[in-house]
Amino acid sequence: MALVAGIGQLDAVVQGGHSATPRPATGPAGPAAHSGRHQYDPDAWWARATGDSREAGGLGRTLAAASVAGQQQRHGALLESAVTVVRPALLWNDTRRPGAAADLIQELGGADKWAEAVGIVPVASLTLTNSGWLARHEPANAAKVAAICLPHDWLTWKLSGS
């Protein structure tokens, strides 16, 4: 079974051991966008992934292998625990945090300091910037975060049970 996780859609493909024809299922991953807010609920995405996989014939039977791939959109599922999502994940194009990258750059002493320290200068679309925005604007949610996973990593974690 293969899951390909994109922001606009999620694809599941299952191929039987003796079958030469993949059975795909494709559907929207469910991002919510309004008033500059672009986010998705990872639990809804998981429901879509498992639904697509069942439709393609991949869940409900023994699998020999599973592969999860994803497009790097620089956002993360914020987790309180392995099963509890803190809030919908901010997408790269969410416009609520235009100053968050500038704030982070200033806190470390400028772009050159960032480049020297970690090899990258924060931009608004990075998970790091999302985390800074969350700490400033939703401190109660930020305090709950125990882990951050990119979407395809979160799906792999959910599929593996660990």
UniProtKB/Swiss-Prot annotation:
Molecular function per GO: ATP binding; D-xylulokinase activity
Coiled coil regions in record: none
EC assignment: 2.7.1.17
Compositional bias of kind Low complexity: 20-33
Record bears the keyword Nucleotide-binding: yes
Region (Disordered): 16-39
The keyword Nucleotide-binding belongs to this UniProt entry's keyword annotation: yes
Catalytic reactions of this protein: D-xylulose + ATP = D-xylulose 5-phosphate + ADP + H(+)
Keyword vocabulary terms for this entry: ATP-binding, Carbohydrate metabolism, Kinase, Nucleotide-binding, Transferase, Xylose metabolism
InterPro entries in UniProt: ATPase_NBD (IPR043129), FGGY_Carb_Kinase (IPR050406), FGGY_N (IPR018484)
Annotated GO biological process: D-xylose metabolic process
Enzyme class: transferase
Origin superkingdom: Bacteria
Entry-linked Pfam families: FGGY_N
Family recorded in the similarity comment: Belongs to the FGGY kinase family.
Function: Catalyzes the phosphorylation of D-xylulose to D-xylulose 5-phosphate.
PANTHER family on file: SUGAR KINASE, XYLULOSE KINASE
Protein name per its UniProtKB record: Xylulose kinase
